[in-house]
C-alpha cells in the first residue's frame, strides 16, 4: 500500500486519553448533570411527600366549591380572612361542617387545633382513625368534589 502513495505516511499517531481533554470534560459534565437531575427528582419527591403528609395531618376535608350548598353550613365569607367564597375556591371543611378557605384553615390549625367559628376540636388523623374503625366511613360531602 505504501508503494501506491510514496509521499504519504499512513501511520496513525499515538493519541492517549490524556491528549483528549474534551472527552474528560464531557464525561465529568455528563455525570454532574445526571447527579443533579437525580437529586432534583429526589427533592421533588420529598416535597410531594411533605405536602401529602401536611394534607393528612388534620382531620378536615378538602373540597372545591362548585355552587352554594346549604347543607355544608357555608357562610358567605371565610371567617379567617373575611373574604367571600368564590366558585372553584379550595375549601377546608371541619368536622362541624364549617367551611373556610383551605389555606386559611391550614394556617389557623397550625396555631390552634380548633374550628375558628365554634372552637370544636379538629382532631389529628391518628385519633380520627381509631374512632373511624368503630363506625362506618363517611362518604363525600354533598355538592362538593373531593380533591385528589
UniProtKB/Swiss-Prot annotation:
Q: Which Pfam families does this UniProt record tie to the protein? A: zf-RING_2 (PF13639)
Keyword Transmembrane helix assigned to the entry: answer is yes
Q: Which residues cross the membrane?
A: 24-44
The family database entries (Gene3D superfamilies) matched by this protein are listed as:
Zinc/RING finger domain, C3HC4 (zinc finger) (3.30.40.10)
Single annotated GO MF: zinc ion binding
Q: Where are the zinc fingers (RING-type)?
A: 78-119
> Cross-referenced InterPro entries, in alphabetical order?
HRD1_E3_ubiq-ligases (IPR050731), RNF24_RING-H2 (IPR048025), Znf_RING (IPR001841), Znf_RING-CH (IPR011016), Znf_RING/FYVE/PHD (IPR013083)
Name the UniProt key words of this record, in alphabetical order: Golgi apparatus, Membrane, Metal-binding, Transmembrane, Transmembrane helix, Zinc, Zinc-finger
UniProt-listed SMART domains = RING (SM00184), RINGv (SM00744)
Q: Where in the cell is it found?
A: Golgi apparatus membrane
Q: Does the keyword Protein biosynthesis apply?
A: no
Gene Ontology cellular component terms for the protein in this record: Golgi apparatus; Golgi membrane
Record's PROSITE patterns? ZF_RING_2 (PS50089)
Which superkingdom is the protein from? Eukaryota
Membrane topology term reads: Single-pass membrane protein
Please describe what this protein does. Answer: May play a role in TRPCs intracellular trafficking.
Q: How does it assemble?
A: Interacts with TRPC1, TRPC3, TRPC4, TRPC5, TRPC6 and TRPC7.
What this protein is called in its record is: RING finger protein 24
Q: What organism is this sequence from?
A: Homo sapiens
Q: What's the gene?
A: RNF24
